[in-house]
């Protein structure tokens, strides 16, 4: 039996936006059953609410951003990833700016915040999106694909011509569970190349980026003094991003995801393609104690 989850307590954090460089105050609040994940721009008058839905994605350049009633919410993928990892279904995310705080560039600080607030089960079954047939989208040589699978599994392959990202560290798979997510994926940081800095700054991107919140590489090496958290941290972060992007489907996917050089744009295209084909998926719940749980979530952490 898998129940919906929300926070036990309200919790707050402060940080800077990776791309905007703006300081942002974030408040995470509990929400009722079937409320879903909703972002709230409290700096606007009137306040605007933006549901975490794939169809509202309008920004896919180096982040995933949502727009609703002209209000933007940028760089949602790391928090969305942490919410998926801990099985949180219902939450209100209040922001004083358009972009979520980047924290350390991973989902680890968001996991800590959510666990510190406490996670509680609610009196309603969690709703899953079960993949019924293969759905694939491509863009050049990039591929993102869902296939039917009893559980939730993610595989990802990256290709970078860089000595710090050899082929043997460019492929990773994970059988999704809270334990696997928190240990193997959540601490993997976003990364960028010095050669791309000029491109980003011309587009007002990465203005809040630093070695405190990203892995930075020159042509030969990692420039961060503390090095990497995992030998294959780069591909693990791509899985972290994918978990967040796919959670915008409006529920936890049950199926196998495969990404080859995929990014935010293709991940969003895949979710939209899945949801657009009514024969490709169905809503399911597991509200009988006799039914095996398809995904292992950690016991709720009561703060």
UniProtKB/Swiss-Prot annotation:
Pathway note: Glycolipid biosynthesis; lipid IV(A) biosynthesis; lipid IV(A) from (3R)-3-hydroxytetradecanoyl-[acyl-carrier-protein] and UDP-N-acetyl-alpha-D-glucosamine: step 2/6
Gene Ontology CC terms: membrane
Keyword Metal-binding applies: yes
Pfam families, per database record: LpxC (PF03331)
GO biological process, one term: lipid A biosynthetic process
Enzyme Commission no: 3.5.1.108
Catalytic residues (UniProt): 264
Keywords, alphabetical: Hydrolase, Lipid A biosynthesis, Lipid biosynthesis, Lipid metabolism, Metal-binding, Zinc
InterPro entries in UniProt: Ribosomal_Su5_D2-typ_SF, UDP-acyl_GlcNac_deAcase, UDP-acyl_GlcNac_deAcase_C, UDP-acyl_N-AcGlcN_deAcase_N
Binding-site residues, Zn(2+): 78, 237, 241
Cofactor entry: Zn(2+)
Enzyme kind, highest EC tier: hydrolase
NCBIfam families: lpxC
Family in the record: Belongs to the LpxC family.
Its biological purpose: Catalyzes the hydrolysis of UDP-3-O-myristoyl-N-acetylglucosamine to form UDP-3-O-myristoylglucosamine and acetate, the committed step in lipid A biosynthesis.
Protein name, entry field: UDP-3-O-acyl-N-acetylglucosamine deacetylase
